[in-house]
Every structure is written in structure tokens, then in C-alpha cells.
Amino acid sequence: MATILYIKASPRGERSHSVTVADAFVKAYSEANPGDVVRVLDVFEADLPAFGTDAVVARYLSGQGDPLSPAQEAAWAAVKRQVEDFKTADKYVIALPMWNFSIPWRLKQFFDIIIQPGLTFSYDEQGYHGLVTGRPVLVSYARGGAYPAGTPAEGWDFQKRYLEHILGFIGFTDIRSVVVEPTLAGGPDTAQAKRAEAVEQARRMALEF
């Protein structure tokens, strides 16, 4: 039995193109794998731990083996719980809209919490090494415009490029993608057609996940 962590990074609910496609993927996967478990983490609804002064100081002090204050202990323990919750999954699905050419701030906050030395990556004289390995991830991207590879517009895409880089940094090598674009620039008819195509693609991909 495998566990999927489904991370929703859009606050738009059913109106979200990225969530609609990811939902279709998860539904098709669950129908094909009824014994597996799907856990949903909506980063806009979740009570994510604050990564403020106490947590930041605790990160450095703990790395040096120095004692922590009670507040620092509590803040760092909350971070480690979030990391362990993330790492207990066997597979991952992410619904991700583009905001200002990048990713929503709540997902960035989530990554800032879980990407920690000794927990999700390590480093030595040879460089950095991801610690979250051997697990596939499916990302459903939605963008208002179109950013095709090999065009000048590709340089504006800090959504897909960032996510693939940060996931690769912590060890992911099997990163699969479904992209819905454009959801705004082409008008509503184009958006609906592109979403329908992406939903069908996601359903097919779910059978091999």
C-alpha cells in the first residue's frame, strides 16, 4: 500500500485549473489503486508552522550542537514534524498555478519550512545531496499565458523551472508534468479546451504512476 501526498497550492478550489486536473489524476489513480491512501495538504488552509526568528536561530544552533531555548525547541520541533509528514509519503501530486510568473507564496513558505539541512538535503565537499529519493511526483501546472520551450516567453517562466529545480535539489528525479496554458490569454473557450485536454492526459498518466 502506497501513500500519496496531494499538495494543493491554489486557493480557488473547484475554479482552479491546476486543481481540476490534479483532482482528475488522483481520482483515476485511486480507482486503479484502491488500496492506496491519498492525504491532502491544502497549503492555504493548513496551519503551517511559522519559520520566524526562533526557528531560524534554532536551525543554526542545532546544526552546531548548541543548546536551544524552550521557544527555539518548540519552533524547531514544529519544523521537523512538518518535514517528517512530508517525507512519509511514497508518491506526490502538486496542483500549482502560476502567480506573477512564479509560485504562490504559501507553497514557497511550505518549501522554506521543509527544505532543511540534514532533513531533506545534506552537503559535503562534493556538494549538495538530496535526501528525498526514489519517489515520483506529478505536477499539474496552470498558467494564464503560454510559455513554450524555445521561445522568448520561456524566460518568463519561474514557476515550472523553480519547482523542478527545488524538487531536484532535495532528491526528486522522477518529475512528471501536465500543463494547462493559456487559461486567460486565449479567452474562456481556449481555457476550457486546454483544461479538458490536460484532464484526459492526467487520467492516462495516472495509470502508470
UniProtKB/Swiss-Prot annotation:
Entry-linked InterPro entries: Flavodoxin_fold, Flavoprotein-like_sf, FMN-dep_NADH:Q_OxRdtase_AzoR1, NADH:quinone_OxRdtase_FMN_depd
Cofactor note: Binds 1 FMN per subunit.
Names of the cofactor(s): FMN
Residues of the signal peptide: none
Record GO terms (molecular function): electron transfer activity; FMN binding; oxidoreductase activity, acting on NAD(P)H as acceptor; oxidoreductase activity, acting on NAD(P)H, quinone or similar compound as acceptor
The entry's keywords: Flavoprotein, FMN, NAD, Oxidoreductase
EC number: 1.6.5.-, 1.7.1.17
Recorded catalytic activity of this chain's protein: 2 a quinone + NADH + H(+) = 2 a 1,4-benzosemiquinone + NAD(+); N,N-dimethyl-1,4-phenylenediamine + anthranilate + 2 NAD(+) = 2-(4-dimethylaminophenyl)diazenylbenzoate + 2 NADH + 2 H(+)
Pfam families, per database record: Flavodoxin_2 (PF02525)
Family under the similarity heading: Belongs to the azoreductase type 1 family.
Function: Quinone reductase that provides resistance to thiol-specific stress caused by electrophilic quinones. Also exhibits azoreductase activity. Catalyzes the reductive cleavage of the azo bond in aromatic azo compounds to the corresponding amines.
Assembly and interaction partners: Homodimer.
The protein, known as: FMN-dependent NADH:quinone oxidoreductase
Lineage: Bacteria, Pseudomonadati, Thermodesulfobacteriota, Desulfovibrionia, Desulfovibrionales
Gene of this entry: azoR
